[in-house]
Amino acid sequence: MSEMNVDALFGDLDELGQITAKNTPMPFLFCVVSWGAAATHWLANTLNAHPDIFCAHCANLFWARLGGARYVDGWQYLRILGRESPASRACGDVHGVSRESIPDLRAKLGERFNCAILVREPLPRLQSQLALFQNWPVKSTWNVDYVQKFIDQDVRLPQDNVINRLFLHGVNMLNSIIHEEPLAPVWRSEDLTTNPVMLARFVEELTRSRVEIEPEWAERATRRPATNPHRRQPALQPPFEDWQIEAISKIVEPQAWQIYDRLGYKTPDFIR
C-alpha cells in the first residue's frame, strides 16, 4: 500500500498506529452483510476454515461487550482484521459490518474490497429471529420504540409488551432486503450450506478470485453441521397466530416480497 494511501486511510491514527499500518501488508478485504438468522455463524466458520481466508463473525460486537472496547464498524473494523491477518489472501467478516458503511468502504478501497448480502427464506428466518428474541435474557438489547409507528398505523397487538413489540421489529427486519439488494449480490444461505458449486462460486466472487476453491474443499464444507441455531425445535404448525399474520401482511412491503420472489422464495399464501 502506497504512502498516499496510508495517509488517506490511516491518517486518524497516532504515530504508532500509522507506522503499524504502513509496515504490515493488507490482504484483500470483504464483508458479508446480513441481519442474522441466516447461517451467518456457519458461513463465517466455513470461510475461516479455508487456509487462505481469515474471517470473523461480528467480532466488533464482542470486543465492545466483552472487552469494553469502543464499537467500530466499516473501515475502522476491517482494517483491524486486515492487519491481524497479513498472510491471508483475503480477510473479512460476516454479520459485523453494517450496510450503511458499504459505500464508504467501496470509495476507500475500490477493487481491494468486495461485499455480498446473505439471506434466507423469510418466514423460517423470522421464526429463528423470534426464538433469539425469546431466549435472550436482556430484551432491551434491541430498540423497539420505533415500532410504535406500526401500532399507530393500526397494527394490533394482543398485549403491548416488549415481546410483542420485538415481533413487530423482527417482521420489519424482513424489509431490509429492499435496502440490501441494491448494495451487492444477494446469496441464499440455503444454497451456500448445501451446494458445493454455489459455495465455491460465492467464495471466488466474494474474494474477486484472490481465493480459488477446490471442489473437494467445497464438498467438505457443505457437510459441516449447522452452528448456533436459535430455534432448537421444529416450529409447530401453524407457525403464526392470526394477529401475527395480520402484522406481517401490513408491515412487510410489497417490494420486499417481490424481491424474495425473484430470489426463488415463495410468497406466503396469506399475502395474496
Where are these regions (language model features)?
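PAPS-dependent sulfotransferases, especially Golgi type II membrane carbohydrate sulfotransferases
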Residues: M1-P25, V162-I163, V171, N175-H179, ...
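PAPS-dependent sulfotransferase catalytic core
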Residues: M1-R89
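Short catalytic/ligand-binding loop motif for oxyanion handling, primarily in non-cytosolic enzymes
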Residues: A38-A44, F62-R65, R99-S101, L123-S128, ...
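Short aromatic-enriched loop/helix-cap "lid" or pocket-rim segments at secondary-structure transitions
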Residues: L66-R70, L105, Q127-A131, P137-V138, ...
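PAPS-dependent sulfotransferase catalytic domain
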Residues: Q76-R79, W136-R201, E205, K250
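Glycine-rich phosphate-binding loop used to anchor ATP phosphates in small-molecule kinases
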Residues: S85-D104
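A short acidic, amphipathic alpha-helical/loop segment
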Residues: S101-K108, S176
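Conserved phosphate-donor/acceptor-positioning beta-strand/loop module used by diverse small-molecule
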Residues: L109-L132
